[in-house]
């Protein structure tokens, strides 16, 4: 019996565990310096929308999150929460036992269609969305990037290449109060680490984490006529630091 116990323990220890990312907000001081003109490159005239991470309680509804094979992932959501999750691309689930998991967009299939027409009349295709457990605390972006609140931009990858750091002067000095009471004074730097089907050309989507709206970023006008200036960052140290905030440690 003792040998069996040791064998089971050895097997458990040898099973590779999923890498868990640290919370980017715990690592981010939002304290990059104001750039010199020589540290900035190409200028863009952009317009912005924002997206966020829905946060809900376990088993709040009856509609399952499913993976690409149609298998249930565990959580069951209300129609509104499910459609919000499909639209935003990720969801944070608070379990009754205290666990927290984030699930992320994986792809689309035609089976197990969820009718979101009553929630998003112009985006009925999101009902085909399938999910997986995310690597990042706030969800995953392109390739191996994780999402970092108030830093990540979803871009048209043919217009702004993933891995590009951008400085937005109008974002510098923005005051953001987090749910835990921490106050961030934004330094104006962002990082292209995600994409979206509706993101084309000069349109960027700003990730705001668990905030539900973005009054602190007045330059986000959700309208292509409301443009602002952004500049490519050339400072390699800042680029590397932003990359690390979007990487699993």
Where is each model-derived feature located?
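Solvent-exposed, well-ordered loop and adjacent helix/strand elements within mature globular domains
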Residues: 22-249
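Sec/Tat signal peptide C-region and signal peptidase I cleavage site
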Residues: 17-21
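Bacterial N-terminal signal peptides
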Residues: 5-14
């Amino acid at each position: 019996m003792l040998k069996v116990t040791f064998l089971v323990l050895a097997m458990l220890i040898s099973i590779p565990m999923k890498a868990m990312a640290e919370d980017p907000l715990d690592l981010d001081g939002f304290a990059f310096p104001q750039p010199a003109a020589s540290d900035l490159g190409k200028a863009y005239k952009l317009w912005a929308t924002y997206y966020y991470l829905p946060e809900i309680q376990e088993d709040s509804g009856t509609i399952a999150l499913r993976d690409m094979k149609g298998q249930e992932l565990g959580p069951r959501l209300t129609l509104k929460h499910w459609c919000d999750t499909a639209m935003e691309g990720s969801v944070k689930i608070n379990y009754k036992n205290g666990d927290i998991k984030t699930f992320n967009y994986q792809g689309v299939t035609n089976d197990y269609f969820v009718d979101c027409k009553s929630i998003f009349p112009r985006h009925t295709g999101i009902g085909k969305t399938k999910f997986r457990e995310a690597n990042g605390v706030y969800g995953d972006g392109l390739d191996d990037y994780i999402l970092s609140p108030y830093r990540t931009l979803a871009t048209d990858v043919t217009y702004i290449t993933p891995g590009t750091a951008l400085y937005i002067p109008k974002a510098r000095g923005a005051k953001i109060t987090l749910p835990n009471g921490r106050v961030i004074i934004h330094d104006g730097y962002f990082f292209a680490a995600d994409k979206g089907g509706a993101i084309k050309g000069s349109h960027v989507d700003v990730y705001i984490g668990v905030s539900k709206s973005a009054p602190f970023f007045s330059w986000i006008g959700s309208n292509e006529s409301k443009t602002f200036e952004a500049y490519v960052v050339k400072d390699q140290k800042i680029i590397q630091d932003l990359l690390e905030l979007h990487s699993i440690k």
